[in-house]
């Protein structure tokens, strides 16, 4: 590790977002110099030694075709104070384990040597593949909840977290969705350069936090599971009949299965219990109505299947992290006021 400036390494690959990689690089590289220049016209010097590395150090194109010229290969880096595994996008229906496994040995060795290990978005999957999140909580994009449950059950995904400090000495830190790299950058700056430097950087780059977390942005995964035809038929039915009374019993009857067998197979196919799946669909539909209409909340609750508006509000807050009225104010596409809260 460097004696003068903390060494920060950004690990990127072909599925990394340019916004994450270059956003992190620009913000971290600016620490110690840009704020002084902007506010005092005084020269400064970079406080952090920031480098981009890849699996082989060769020039490549990241997600979207943007060229990346790494400073080095990951194996050229034997020591660093902190490394960031940038997002490495994977379709939720795929299995990225082979792609991620090439980084595992280096990540484990870096952690064993004392480096802080952090990730952004799907970068947490890379850490999980290396076994570094076993027995720990983690943040990642909300859409990867089922993938974590299926491929990495030893890790616990906190779907609403923006930053998750997952090791008691804070040497493993994971960040949620793609733009949560901003929170991670400020955390890194505060950790290595102090709170004042982090605040100065936030002012220069106009960075602010995701105060609502991820839940308001989360959407239900509607993918039909083709491997279980019975459950697929039930998914197709509930997609059109989510507001029906007693929908779980209706799906059970449609399946022709005993209740416990149906619940077990539904959970296995979708990653959710039948009632959780129904509630997620109903709240997703309610979100779209709040975004696009001025209908009163009471009317929306009834339209998606809740006759008790209070129960609807409780469920909405549980799944979305906010109230229907606050969600409408933040996300309404029409800019119209609600006719009842």
Language-model features: locations:
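N-terminal beta1-alpha1 cap of cysteine-dependent amidohydrolase-like domains
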Residues: 2-78
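Flexible gly/pro-rich beta->alpha loop and the following alpha-helix that scaffold active-site loops
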Residues: 49-117
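Catalytic nucleophile loop
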Residues: 103-143
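Conserved anion/nucleotide-ligand pocket segment
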Residues: 165-204
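A short, Lys/Arg-enriched amphipathic alpha-helix from helix-turn-helix/homeodomain DNA-binding modules
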Residues: 220-246, 252-255, 276-295
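Basic/polar phosphate-binding segments, predominantly the helix-turn-helix DNA-binding elements
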Residues: 239-240, 245-281, 301-323
């Amino acid at each position: 590790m460097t004696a003068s400036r903390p060494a920060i390494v950004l690990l990127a690959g072909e599925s990394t977002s340019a916004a994450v990689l270059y956003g992190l690089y620009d913000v971290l590289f600016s620490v110690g110099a840009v704020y002084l220049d902007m506010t005092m016209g005084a020269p400064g010097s970079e406080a952090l030694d920031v480098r981009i590395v890849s699996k082989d150090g060769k020039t490549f194109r990241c997600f979207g075709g943007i060229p990346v010229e790494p400073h080095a290969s990951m194996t050229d880096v034997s020591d660093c104070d902190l490394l960031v595994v940038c997002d490495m996008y994977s379709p939720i229906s795929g299995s990225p384990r082979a792609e991620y496994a090439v980084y595992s040995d280096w990540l484990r060795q870096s952690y064993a040597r004392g480096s802080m290990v952090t990730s952004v978005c799907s970068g947490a999957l890379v850490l999980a593949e290396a076994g570094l999140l076993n027995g720990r909580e983690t943040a990642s994009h909300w859409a990867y909840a089922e993938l974590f449950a299926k491929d990495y059950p030893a890790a616990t995904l906190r779907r609403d977290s923006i930053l998750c400090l997952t090791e008691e000495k804070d040497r493993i830190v994971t960040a949620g969705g793609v733009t949560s790299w901003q929170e991670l950058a400020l955390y890194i700056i505060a950790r290595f350069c102090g709170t004042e430097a982090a605040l100065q950087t936030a002012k220069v780059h106009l960075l602010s936090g995701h105060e609502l977390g991820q839940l308001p942005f989360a959407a239900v995964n509607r993918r039909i599971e083709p491997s279980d035809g019975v459950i697929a038929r039930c998914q197709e039915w509930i997609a059109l009949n989510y507001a029906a009374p007693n929908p779980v019993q209706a799906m059970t009857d449609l399946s022709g299965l005993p209740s416990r067998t149906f619940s077990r197979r539904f959970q296995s196919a979708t990653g959710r219990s039948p009632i959780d799946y129904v509630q997620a669909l109903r709240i997703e539909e309610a979100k779209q109505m709040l975004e696009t209409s001025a209908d009163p909340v009471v009317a929306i609750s009834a339209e998606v299947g809740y006759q008790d508006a209070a129960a609807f509000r409780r469920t909405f807050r549980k799944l979305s992290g906010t109230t229907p009225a606050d969600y409408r104010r933040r996300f309404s596409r029409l800019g119209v006021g609600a006719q009842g809260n």
